[in-house]
Amino acid sequence: MKGGNIVTNWHLLHFFDQQQPRKATVLRQILTNKRTGSVLFWGLRYHYLDYLNAVPRLDVKKFDDVIDELLAQKWLHSSTRGLQLTSQGQKVLATHQTAYSFTDHPELNQKFDYQLWQAILLLMVQVASEYRYHNSNYYVANQNLKAQFLIKSWLQVNSFETLATEISECLAQFLDQCDPAKADLFTAKLVGHTQNGLSDGQIASQLEISPLEVSWTWRDLALQLAAFIRARSNLKIGQLVQITALPGALTPTIRQTAMLFNEGKTVDQIIQMRRLRRSTIEEHLQVLAISQPDFPYEKILSESDLETLTKVYAETAIDQWQYAELQQQGIEMPFLKFRLYAIMKTHGEYNE
């Protein structure tokens, strides 16, 4: 994903559907980790939420240019409701995709700072390898100063032997459970005493895939390795992984709203206690409902509300619901209730 470019000329087709129109702006905002209530709602509707923060440095112009190209190729079709995958586009996907085309665990981009973790990982492997060969005079392949500082600080408390033993054992165990071809791709990029890591381009040439697919696959495996190490609490190198951990989907301010809401406070009480705008608190509750399938909707949606909303929207697909429909029928209801009902019904669809 160097330079924030996540696609060749067809990879974005993966995010579109033949039945459901989807807006490219939502995909772009999801990839760059925009977390407004509206973006997250449509991300939920489009099954995009696992891809939050997948490309934080996305080149927006290149993204837009690729969308235009896919439309020009007639692999996507545009309507007022969004973009849909065409039958031609589906054939392109089926023909071109390989085992390296898409990540297996995109959700891990939300759990770890990839740029920092990648630098730490590459340095750990190199330092461990040189230690095994009793070599203390070598050129450090990765120039990330923060990663260098963190590893030096860690080694002031822990031994080189611990580093070498733990990282070698973890790599062996982790790669043993991976697809062999992907494991080979991953190790080809590592730097050691007698091994100069290959570039994405060199690996791509060997495997006859695109450099992007090499980058994407390596990133996916690196993040999986971070999760693998963190799950083993006895490992000292887990401290280095933990440094790269991201705070998660819920910001501290949303967590504070959640705490008050779970204590039984009403929306009005939370607004008064937190001295925040109603729109802010209501957005917090939308984000909570999106991220928590067991959200207690009954605290906000009464039986009467549910009856009204069901009557108005029963015959319409969720993607086509309009808040204005309530007003047109002379029904006064806060937008929060309308949106929470849509979120509740969406989670219900996915659990059927």
Kindly give the residue locations of the regions a language model identified:
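Basic amphipathic alpha-helical segments that dock to polyanions
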Residues: K62-H77, D220-A222, L288, K345
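Exposed, interaction-prone assembly regions rather than primary DNA-binding/catalytic cores
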Residues: S101-D176
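A short, conserved structural fragment
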Residues: D68-R81, A227-F228, D294, T346-E352
